[in-house]
Curated annotation (Swiss-Prot):
This is Ankyrin repeat and LEM domain-containing protein 2. It is found in: Endoplasmic reticulum membrane. It is a single-pass type III membrane protein. Residues 29-964 are cytoplasmic. GO terms for cellular component: endoplasmic reticulum membrane. Residues 71-115 form the LEM domain. Residues 1-7 are extracellular. The chain crosses the membrane at residues 8-28. It comes from Mus musculus (Mouse). The gene is Ankle2. Interacts with BAF/BANF1. Interacts with protein phosphatase 2A (PP2A) components PPP2C (PPP2CA or PPP2CB) and PPP2R1A. Belongs to the ANKLE2 family.
Amino acid sequence: MLWQRLAVVEWAALAWELLGASVLFIAVRWLVRRLEKRPRDLNRCGTLSSPPSASEAVAAQPGEVTMDAMMARLKLLNPDDLRKEVMKAGLKCGPITSTTRFIFEKKLAQALLEQGGLLTSSLPKPSAVTAMAFIQGTSRTPPSVDGKQTQQACFSEDRDFGYSVGLNPPEEEAVASSVHPVPFSASTRNDNHKAGVTAPKEPLVYYGVCPVYEDGPVRHERIHVYEDKKEALQAAKLIKGSRFKAFRTREDAEKFARGICDYLPSPNKTTPLLSPVKAVPLGGSDGLKADGLCLAESETVNKERANSYKNPRTQDLTAKLRKAVENGEEHTFSDLIWSNPRYLIGSGDNPTIVQEGCRYNVMHVAAKENQASMCQLTLETLENPEFMRLMYPDDNMDMLQKRILYVVDLYLNTPDKVGFDTPLHFACKFGNVDVVNVLSSHPLIVKNRKNKYGKTPEEVICERSQNKSPALKERIREYLMGHYYVPLLRAEDTSPVIGELWSSDQKAEASNTAHCRSSPRDPVMTLRAFVGPLSPSKAEDFRKLWKTPPRKKAGFFHSIRKSDPERGIERVGRELAHELGYPWVEYWEFLGCFVDLSSQEGLQRLEEYLIQKELSKKAQQEIRENEGCLQDRTSDFGSGKKYSNSISVGAFLDGDDDSSLEEIKNQQNTVPSQSQPTTDKFQTSKSGSLPLGQKVDPGETSVGTYPDKGRNGFCHPLNHRTADGRGLEATNGEEALPPPVSVLTQELNKLNLQSLGDSLHETPDKNGKLEDEVLPSRKGAADSDLLASPPAIASLGKKQVRTNTEVSEAMAEMSLGPKSPQLGVQAGLEPILSSATVDSTKRLFLSGEEPSKLDRDVLAALECANIDPGLYPAIHRWKSTVMCYSPSDRQSWPSPALKGKFTTELVDLDCSHSCSGRCSPAGSSPSKPGHTSSSSGLHSPGRYSPAHGRHFQRVAHVARLAAL
């Protein structure tokens, strides 16, 4: 028991000893911390070289160190030194930023004033005042050597960097070096010591105000240089468009106010950059003497002026531009961007933001609102060099192309700020298939870019529109797979070749290599038609189907290709494409473009062409009518002989005016049997057809018997009679006609010779029937117009003088056959003749005055089209005229004369496996990229189809070079 008690006592004593030792250790540690927290004694260094402390200054001159002076002193410290002083003062220190710095400065100043201490390690030596005002980007002002002076901080009036530095802001170090420091004691001197040292009165900063000069300042114009910042601000407000800037010397401010050395050269210039700030440091003692680039004896400089377009306001971008894009207002959109290109191109050639927060540009908004036409119009405008030249008028074409590629790439592939979605993401997400078609066809589009959630455009198809059909989703996927075309090429000898698949994603090297390997003897291949855009699999299947038609229609397609070597394979491809529902276009020379005539756009173009042709024909007829009427008036004064409406027998007699009417009729009836085979050749000539069906009675014949004369556009002197029943003697006003008998004899001889040359084309039978050779389908078209004259007869009429031509026309009118409706009195066909006269001016064909194979080809292209007479009246009239002829007659129509070579866009296709050929330059292209207008429909061949392949490859080639 005793042993146990001793053990307990020992353990208790040991525990008390340990507890006492712990308490002692804690007390010592507390005392050490208290000693560390006490401010250091700054008076222990008695040497004169060490800077005096703030406590000594306070003790020597109590009440002179104020809170403002302490705050000014602390502003000269950099963030690291300020953090050290805060820690030494025993205060908690967080991150020091531009917003929190003032809080820590104020706390530290209060603590130092309470403790009577000041900064120690951060104070610079007195020699630093004359050496440099700023060290490591921050101002450190040493105290004065004079111990009787108090220490204060000196800081510039313009502490906010970048407030008034103009267009070319200087470097931060340059601005820092431009401020001359003042000793800290100079600002905190007592009134008792102000008499000792006086500060200079000269201002430290000069403010130059630069107005907007058109051709430089006038010689006697005032130069705006101010010493007060408020005055400079007031002047800048009064002078519209001006800007001001702070300078160290008055000379620099005057140069700035005159507009000298203020503009930077264009990126295409090779001259060095001229900047008054970067060329010479403003704090240097040499001023601008070190670099003479900014000095000009005449104070003028060869500078490049920027464009005069101002940045649009945010309200205009939102209320005008974005609203026009959302509503699809193309005209308003075009007016805005062409009036100020900065609506599309912002600073740094970046897309203009039309919706802040999400940072949407025009392409984002158009893709989101399903405005495919606005996307296409935006791309076409940005790729127009003339539009970019508005922004950079001094750039050459190479620089403009680089800028265009840069801006277009940003518009197509810039993600938004919220979900990192590109315009293609928006189009796929909302199921806007037309927008996907436009965007995915561009060569600069990136189709596999991922958004914030790591999804590509293909993975977000119809995420925001779940009610879309599966067929539409499949179409979007096909567009994202690529746009492929099946082209049809033709050589100069019209031999067709179905080329390899063509896509906008193909590289240009392959086509260039094939171009170099082609032989000079190979024919030049031209693009005539193409199918697409299609997916790669569909394009390959259609190419095989086009080359080898299905067995059921193989015979029919084979007969078409053999019977029509000029456009047979186009007909086969057209029918296959329409049957499968694939886009199809072919080139038509008379329209000058690639188009599908059965589409709405094709019908509209054909309607415009026919209307223009009708107007042109009517204008020519009016000109002839005016000429004839003028000649009638001039010849009316010298007329002395009588002529009937038709050529009477008086025309065959030399001056016998007393012939009776019955003799005239008898001799007139003997003429048709002699010249029947050649009469119809004169029905329609280059000068027009004659009005038929006039009465023979001279008493009833007058000018008023031609109700349709003005409408038809003909006013022939031989068909006119004066009011007294007499005809006109001469066509000129001065010379009379030669003897009519001799003239008609010469004409008959010429016609006999001409009929021998025309015997190969037409052979009339004994009865004089010309329905099968000259007038096709006359049996089923009683009210159709007369067939146009052959080219040989037309050329013959051109070579004759006007008098002979008029007599020939009169003879043709006289010598109409029995089946030709000429004598209304005898045959009783006056109503029919009037309609024939009216319809003769409505004859309308696509090429010339007579039907040709072109009419047959266009009719075949419109076979499946539903033509509404109300919407397309001209097409309806043309089709009715062509359908009056039988199919066998239409097969015999000749091909129109080709006007030169094929002028289509010659595309460099890699057709070395299927054909050998080289492509001619694109200078003779009928569908140049520059001619593409925004009004073209989305279903017409776009800028990136084979119709514009050369432009396409050029863009891809330049983009590839830019990427390198």
